Amino acid sequence: MRKIIAFAIALTLGFQGIVCAQDNKEEEKNGLQFTEQKRLPVTSVKSQDRAGTCWSWSSISFLESEIIRLGKDSVSLAPLYIVWNTYNEKAKKYVRMHGNLNFGQGGAFADVLWAIENYGIVPLSEYSGLNYGEEIHAHGELDAILKAYLDAVVKNPNKKLSTAWLRGYDAVLDAYLGAKPEKFNYKGKEYTPVSFYKEATGLNAADYISLTSFTHHPFYTSFPLEIPDNWIGEKSYNIPIDELMGIMDKAIDNGYTFAWGTDVSEDGFSRKGLAVVPDFDNYEMADAEIAKWVSMPKIMKMAEWLKNPGKEKQIDQQMRQEAFDNYQTTDDHGMHAIGKAVDQNGNKYFIVKNSWGEYGDYKGYLYASYSFVEYKTLNIVIHKDAIPKDIKKKLNIQ
């Protein structure tokens, strides 16, 4: 979940400049009209700004909704507390692997659950992660320094690693993100990060599992999803796409949101707040317009499709697999699915909370069609109780 930082930067800068072709769509007109069927409780929309940390913001948003679902007081949690701990653990593994590990701002949902289980969590009010003279998150300099530091350690110029390298590395994290709080007061009670996690949130990290759907591994088994940002090697349960779609659909009906890993590099992903998979080959038009349509650039086809919405592609398991195998689907972005809606033609959508601030037509939310979700979902993280008993039995989930 790394490439999306370029688009997030554009959003932070008010869309100055053209990035990833999305800004060419400035005059897109949206002909879709939505009726929301269900919207589950969430905290406010936040922004990752100019940092590639969507994995932390989206996971934290998901867990904030879980806290509400579990009957605890709503609280905004600190994504950068997770980032500090993840950077620390990733550094240790990077050095252990002699530099043969993906290192950068990106991460995965599993990182957040691992960090909370091991280091707890704190409210956003206790840890902003802004300790470097900026009002917004911008991690380019930090990431470059950390990578250069670790590469110098891995070169091992003294022929033996010192006992100081990790202390020095953590000092850089403290300088940029701030020292982690050891104790803090929240609503009149003193907590440590671990006691806050265990006493105030109602969360149990072990209750959350990752689901995916690809054919290069057997269904109803688990495997580490082969994406660069899965540095921690977390396993996902593999099920057919129709079952995964059914779980997501029923989860919302039953009051469960989920963290959603996807790829937003498709032409059908619009910064206006839409994610669709247009079937340009079968777009209905007058015969006289066909020749013009065939030669039209995709960006213009997309604009026309949005003005006069047509059909979407029919997605199947093979299409998903081919897109993953040929790098058309990559670990691009993490978001938080929080509801369901239909358009004026009866087509279904998930309501998705993003972490780019209150941008676009829907103020930080977007509508992702079921076709898009079916095609571009890498994995989801969800509470195990949202999974039907028959599927849990197949997966041997207790």
Model-derived features: positions:
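Active-site signature of cysteine proteases
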Residues: 167-398
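Short, positively charged
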Residues: 24-31, 312-315
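Bacterial Sec-dependent N-terminal signal peptides
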Residues: 1-25
